[in-house]
Structure formats: C-alpha cells, structure tokens
Amino acid sequence: MAMPNFGDMMKQLQEAGAKMQDLQKQLEKLVSEGEAGGGMVRAKVNGRQKLLELTIDPEIMDDVDMVQDLVVAAVNKALEASAQLAQSEIQKAAGGMINPADLMKQFGGQG
C-alpha cells in the first residue's frame, strides 16, 4: 500500500477550512421566513439558525395564548426552512472536500 502524501493532505485540510469559513459567512446571509395565522405572525432566521426578525400583527395582541402559539409556529417554520437551505448550501460547499472515509482508508482504517 502506498504511503499517503502528507503535504497534499495538509493542503486539502487547509482548503477545507477556508471553505468552511466562507460557508459560515454565506449561511449568515441566507434568510428564511416562516409565518403562522395567515401571516399574522412572521419570523425571519438566517442560515445559522439565528432569529433576525419577528413581526406580530397588532390586531391579535389581545389574545396572549394565540400570539404565543403563533410565534412558536412561525419561528419553527422559519427554522425548518433555514435548516433545509443550510443543508443544501453545505452539500454544495462540500463538493471536492476530503471524504473522511477516504482519509481513513489511506491510513489503513475502515471507511
């Protein structure tokens, strides 16, 4: 079995690290939205799962229980959409990165 080229592997790891930093920045810029109650409550989150904005229609403010339920629903929908979008971006960014299974095989491990 040929010995792995550590110089190439280190270069690949550095490139992967740079890609991950770029990806983190991209995820912060991605915005997903969720709404509940026919749009009475709207939530916006970024690709890093940070709540950016929460909008509540003033007409529903008298019903605290309903507002609470709608806020939870809207935020959860926004987080779900954000997670799906982030996963898609991560998969795109991971193209060409080191595959951990391949790395293990190079060292004689099982991948």
From Swiss-Prot:
It comes from the Bacteria. One of its GO terms (cellular component) is bacterial nucleoid. Belongs to the YbaB/EbfC family. Transmembrane segments: none annotated. Homodimer. Keywords: Cytoplasm, DNA-binding. One of its GO terms (molecular function) is DNA binding. This is Nucleoid-associated protein CT0805. InterPro entries: YbaB-like_sf, YbaB/EbfC. Its main location: cytoplasm. Binds to DNA and alters its conformation. May be involved in regulation of gene expression, nucleoid organization and DNA protection. It is found in: Cytoplasm, Nucleoid.
